[in-house]
């Protein structure tokens, strides 16, 4: 099967490619591509990758009209555009090719996360080996919850892991090295995450929970 990831930030694209390699995907029968759509003709590039057939499913993760138009343009026959990222602007709109809705069976769906059954399925998949560590970019304690929740739209990165029995400011994993210059705990956590390709991991979690007074 074909899977293409696009973004306009090359650093993010490179990071994703280092975590989820094309070789690993190929071993599971997936033809994985990473494409920077910030330059050139992204529609032509993506259509070429698909062999000119377009895509069965296109997931739009940002409420940007130009991105929606690109997604619409690369749908294949009976293709589904999944608008995942909900906009804040109640007047948000974007052009959509309704000729293809009628003649090419294109359709649109909006999702904003999963239900309880989806969560159960996700937990089951994790138990079977799916690793969610690549999603986590920040670690914090219970005292960080309020500010993190209120300022979430302004905090970059991915998921924030909160340990409710710890007192710890929300801390980016990428900041461990700098913090480790003055706090040995963070130096040790930095060593552990670097040993796991920069990812939060059970070893680091165990160490953190065993040294709550050193945060």
Q: What function would you assign to each model-found segment?
A:
Residues 1-37:
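Mid-domain Rossmann-like dinucleotide-binding core that forms the NAD(H)/NADP(H) cofactor-binding site
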Residues 8, 38-39, 85-89, 113:
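Short, acidic/turn-prone active-site loops that include or flank metal/cofactor-
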Residues 9-16, 90-93, 169-171:
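Short, charged/polar "capping" segments at the starts of alpha-helices
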Residues 15-27, 39-48, 53, 66-73, ...:
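C-terminal hydrophobic helical "lid"/dimerization subdomain
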Residues 57-62:
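Short, well-ordered coil/turn residues at beta-beta hairpins
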Residues 65-69, 73, 85-105, 117-122:
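Rossmann-fold NAD(P)-binding glycine/threonine-rich loop
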Residues 79-80:
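Glycine-centered, small-residue-biased loops immediately flanking beta-strands
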Residues 83, 103-111, 133-134:
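Short beta-alpha connecting loops at secondary-structure transitions
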């Amino acid at each position: 099967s074909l899977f293409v990831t696009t973004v306009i930030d090359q650093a993010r694209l490179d990071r994703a490619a280092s975590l989820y390699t094309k070789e690993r995907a190929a071993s599971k029968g997936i033809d994985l591509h990473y494409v920077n759509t910030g330059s050139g003709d992204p529609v032509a590039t993506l259509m070429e990758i698909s062999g000119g057939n377009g895509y069965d499913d296109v997931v739009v993760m940002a409420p940007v009209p130009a991105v929606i138009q690109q997604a619409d343009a690369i749908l294949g026959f009976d293709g589904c555009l999944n608008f995942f990222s909900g906009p804040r602007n109640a007047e948000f709109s974007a052009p959509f090719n309704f000729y293809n809705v009628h003649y090419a069976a294109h359709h649109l769906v909006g999702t904003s996360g999963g239900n309880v059954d989806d969560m159960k399925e996700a937990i089951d998949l994790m138990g079977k080996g799916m690793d969610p560590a690549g999603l986590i970019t920040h670690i914090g304690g219970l005292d960080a919850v309020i500010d993190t929740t209120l300022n979430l739209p302004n905090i970059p990165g991915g998921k924030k892991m909160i340990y409710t029995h710890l007192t710890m400011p929300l801390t980016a994993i990428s900041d461990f090295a700098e913090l480790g210059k003055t706090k040995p705990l963070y130096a040790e956590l930095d060593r552990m995450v670097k040993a796991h390709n920069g990812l939060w991991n059970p070893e680091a979690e165990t160490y953190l929970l065993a040294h709550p007074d050193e945060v």
